[in-house]
A protein has these predicted regions:
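Conserved alpha-helical scaffold segments that buttress catalytic/binding sites
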Residues: 1-175
Length: 175
């Protein structure tokens, strides 16, 4: 494989670092470690990819980004669900609460910083939240109607003013 991108950018010298797997059963310790590592990567201006099992890993990733930057950032959330619950199954750091925790961050100015794509289901708590807050969303049905090109243009237009954007994909966006 040649060391270039499809835009003929030279990748020679590009380094990939695997920070390892996280196995700690203590969610608090796990979150602190992920947050610290992400913050360090962002401070070093490194591009990173986080691959995790449970979507709750988004919470410490966003906290790490937030602690490392000094400007507002956007979030593109591609998922079958909003993940906007204040609490789910007794936990505020559940996979269903990731974006609710995001809007509590210093550099996320409420739900308007988030663009939800592919949503096909919502919890009652999320519907109540949406009644009182502006939420950018293209549902799965609307995506089908608009088509990929129009969705991409809509999202680009809405998110263009952000210097930094975090993209998160939950596996159920594929079905």
């Amino acid at each position: 494989i040649p060391p270039t991108t499809e835009y003929f950018e030279n990748l020679t010298g590009t380094k990939v670092v695997d920070l390892g797997d996280y196995y700690d059963d203590d969610c608090e310790i796990l979150f602190e470690e992920v947050e610290r590592n992400v913050s360090n990567l962002v401070c070093e201006d490194k591009f990173f990819t986080m691959i995790g099992g449970d979507h709750s890993v988004t919470i410490p990733v966003l906290r790490g980004i937030d602690s490392a930057i000094d400007h507002e950032f956007g979030i593109i959330h591609i998922d079958a669900h909003f993940d906007l619950c204040d609490e789910l199954e007794g936990s505020k750091v559940s996979h269903g609460c990731t974006e609710r925790r995001a809007i509590e961050l210093n550099h996320v100015n409420g739900s308007e910083n988030i663009f939800f794509i592919g949503i096909r289901s919502a919890e009652v708590d999320e519907l109540n939240f949406m009644k009182n807050n502006r939420v950018n969303v293209i549902s799965a049905a609307e995506f089908e109607r608009l088509g990929t090109s129009q969705v991409v243009e809509t999202v680009k237009e809405k998110m263009a003013h952000f210097k930094s954007i975090y993209l998160t994909l939950d596996i159920d966006c594929l079905d």
